[in-house]
Amino acid sequence: LPILNLFPDYTEKHTDGSNQFIYSRFLVPHLMEYTGKAIFIDGDMIVRDDIVKLWNLTNGHTHWDVAVVKHDYQTKMTEKYLGAKNENYPRKNWSSVMIWNCNTYPNRKLTPEFIENATGAELHRFTWIDDDRILELPKEWNWLPDEFGPNLDAKLLHYTLGTPCFHEFATTPQGEEWHREHMLADYCLQRTDI
């Protein structure tokens, strides 16, 4: 389901991103009508543990607007999948796994109009949220094997440079897990009695 089709009052105007949908993630609180909490994860990931465990990591915390893995690294490549640009910037990949506290006052600023007019830097750096209200999640919940190497304890693998379906990333660390999941997703039980 293309999420942008759910927002007739939103027009994607950004030209500074690697793809046309990288800003739609910030529409999640609006989609949730600014109530409850919600998880957003990028599409180039494999969740290796029960996602309820991720959901529960915010339980018991009262003063937070968003929960993220607070990566601090420099990328290995200036170009990623399909020739998309890959730049270093503060808080890189923080917005790739988020638990939103949708009903907080700061997140009510995330209207379609605000997102259309904010820069990518403003959005991906969470400039409308005070730093002390950005809850930190364990790094295992947004592990970047193509940047950090393999981690058998990772709860979520994020192939941020390019999924192993692209030839140039086919042998990326822990790429075999991607290939296995792809094979299982495409598997179809066949009749053997013919």
Indicate residue ranges for each PLM-predicted region:
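A general structural signal for short secondary-structure junctions and capping/turn motifs
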Residues: 30, 56-59, 87-90, 125-129, ...
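GT-A fold catalytic core of metal-dependent nucleotide-sugar glycosyltransferases
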Residues: 24-76, 99, 106
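A short acidic, often aromatic-flanked loop/helix-cap motif at beta-alpha or helix-coil junctions
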Residues: 3-10, 74-76, 142-146
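Active-site glycine-rich loop that binds ribose-phosphate moieties when present
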Residues: 77-84, 116-122
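Internal, well-ordered alpha/beta segment that forms a basic, Gly-enriched binding/recognition surface
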Residues: 77-83, 89-96, 100-106
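Short, P/G- and charge-enriched loop/turn segments at secondary-structure junctions
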Residues: 13-17, 82-87
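A glycosyltransferase accessory/donor-loop signature
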Residues: 2, 97-194
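Active-site-proximal specificity loops/subdomain of glycosyltransferases
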Residues: 1-34
